């Protein structure tokens, strides 16, 4: 990719609309303005002008905006044509611009990439642009704006600065071992390291919430046939998404519903009843059910309350619980409380959450909704929250691992050189979030997922 080229792309969605925008960025943007507008508009003022073809005829007329670099989104000279949103008109205008030498169609995300490369925004902020466009809820959109304004980046940069300060002390202890003050053993480095680890844990917790807000929580409903799994899916979805009958094994395949609970996206997955398969189709359905369970963020273990009084999942179905990943959160849902007369509500039983409800009548469903929010650490008040991606979580986790290893080197061996290296690696992992340290491959993967005009 040649970043010295002047690029152009449509910045509005394809199709018919009231307004269509073409964006130009690069050194030849001023030349484009002279040839199509007949003049260079006043910087940052809206000029109503005809857009001219090569023969002088008018292709369209509309608003022209001129942003000379470096005071523009990309940091380069930027020109925008805001005309009528007909696809034919926009195509003619685009062809006219591309007929000029040195111009080409922008690659996906190239405008944002140039803004990043020209230090107009960091990598986390650039990703927030795409997240804001793709936001599926009001809370996700607000958190994306926070990320775009630098809330997440500021938290990360504070951690990086703290590590820089800590590394200065450690490097001094290594370089000047004969000094009267032993920086490694006087407790100051240990105290600072503990504080950085604590602050990083807080950022990781907020980032996990931001990731859930962006990507959604995968909740799998599992259990024996006829426990009420499909009825629960319908109750949570608020519509008849799944067929419900008294015939065991009605659900043969995986059913998915995407819902929001107070702005938090959930992917609710209904699975085939787990039992010895009676035919090949059911066997495949059960295999798929286990695949979904093993990939879940949370499992709702549906139990027909009329068949057992047990509340401990290990007593209800020990083989099922034994097969689950140890770290997977499981909530036991005792269904048919309208028949058994059980009190609706949530309680803790032997390390598992237990909810009594009726999927058929809807009693207790709100308790389940509230439980799903709280079990994932989600708070309805996330004014200062930010969105995070999986790569951000991985970088934060890697940084935490290096800090814990550095702590071990400090406390167990007083190994200053090894501690310094772990601090450097932690700092490098954090710097990947904002793009201060990043590979070309990483940048390519991130910006290739953007819209063309961004």
From Swiss-Prot:
Q: Which Gene3D superfamilies match?
A: P-loop containing nucleotide triphosphate hydrolases, Probable tRNA modification gtpase trme, domain 1, tRNA modification GTPase MnmE domain 2
Q: Which UniProt keywords apply?
A: Cytoplasm, GTP-binding, Hydrolase, Magnesium, Metal-binding, Nucleotide-binding, Potassium, tRNA processing
* Binding residues for GTP: 226-231, 245-251, 270-273, 335-338, 358-360
One family from Pfam that matches here is TrmE_N
Q: Binding of Mg(2+): at which residues?
A: 230, 251
Please give the CDD domains that the UniProt record associates with this protein.
trmE, TrmE_N
This protein's cofactor list reads:
K(+)
Enzyme Commission number, as recorded: 3.6.-.-
Quick one: a GO biological-process term for this protein? tRNA methylation
* MF (Gene Ontology): GTP binding; GTPase activity; metal ion binding
In the record, the note on similarity to other proteins reads: Belongs to the TRAFAC class TrmE-Era-EngA-EngB-Septin-like GTPase superfamily. TrmE GTPase family.
Protein name (database record)? tRNA modification GTPase MnmE
The taxonomic lineage of its organism, from the top, reads: Bacteria, Pseudomonadati, Pseudomonadota, Gammaproteobacteria, Enterobacterales
């Amino acid at each position: 990719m040649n970043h010295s080229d002047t690029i152009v792309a449509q910045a509005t969605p394809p199709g018919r609309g009231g307004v269509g925008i073409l964006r130009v960025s690069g050194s030849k943007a001023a030349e484009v303005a002279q040839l199509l507008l007949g003049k260079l508009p006043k910087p940052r003022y809206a000029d109503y002008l005809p857009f001219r073809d090569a023969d002088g005829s008018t292709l369209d007329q509309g608003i022209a905006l001129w942003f000379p670099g470096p005071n523009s989104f990309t940091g380069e000279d930027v020109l925008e044509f805001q005309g009528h949103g007909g696809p034919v008109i926009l195509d003619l205008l685009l062809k006219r611009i591309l007929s000029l030498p040195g111009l080409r169609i922008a690659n996906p995300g190239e405008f944002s990439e140039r803004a990043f490369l020209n230090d107009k925004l960091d990598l986390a902020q650039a990703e927030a642009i795409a997240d804001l466009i793709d936001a599926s809820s009001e809370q996700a959109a607000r958190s994306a704006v926070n990320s775009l304004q630098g809330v997440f980046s500021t938290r990360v940069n504070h951690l990086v600065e703290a590590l820089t300060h800590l590394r200065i002390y450690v490097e001094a202890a290594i370089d000047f071992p004969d000094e009267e003050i032993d920086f490694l053993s006087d407790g100051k480095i240990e105290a600072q390291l503990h504080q950085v680890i604590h602050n990083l844990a807080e950022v990781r917790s907020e980032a996990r919430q931001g990731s859930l807000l962006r990507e959604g929580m995968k909740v799998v409903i599992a259990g024996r046939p006829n426990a009420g799994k499909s009825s629960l899916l319908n109750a949570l979805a608020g519509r008849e998404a799944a067929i419900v009958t008294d015939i065991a094994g009605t659900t043969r395949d995986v059913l998915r519903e995407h819902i929001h609970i107070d702005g938090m996206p959930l992917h609710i997955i209904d699975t085939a009843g787990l039992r010895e398969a009676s035919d090949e189709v059911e066997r495949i359905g059960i295999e798929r059910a286990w695949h979904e369970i093993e990939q879940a963020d949370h499992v709702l273990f549906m139990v027909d309350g009329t068949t057992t009084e047990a509340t401990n999942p290990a007593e209800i179905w020990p083989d099922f619980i034994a097969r689950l990943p140890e770290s997977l959160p499981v909530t036991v849902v005792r269904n048919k409380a309208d028949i058994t007369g059980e009190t609706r509500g949530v309680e803790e039983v032997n390390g598992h959450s237990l909810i009594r409800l009726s999927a058929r009548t809807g009693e207790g469903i709100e308790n389940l909704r509230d439980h799903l929010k709280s079990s994932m650490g989600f708070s309805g008040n996330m004014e200062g929250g930010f969105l995070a991606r999986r790569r951000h979580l991985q970088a934060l986790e890697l940084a935490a691992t290096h800090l814990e290893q550095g702590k071990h080197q400090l406390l167990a061996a007083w190994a200053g050189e090894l501690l310094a290296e772990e601090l450097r690696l932690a700092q490098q992992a954090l710097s990947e979030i904002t793009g201060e340290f990043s590979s070309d491959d990483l940048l390519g993967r991130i910006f290739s997922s953007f819209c063309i005009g961004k």
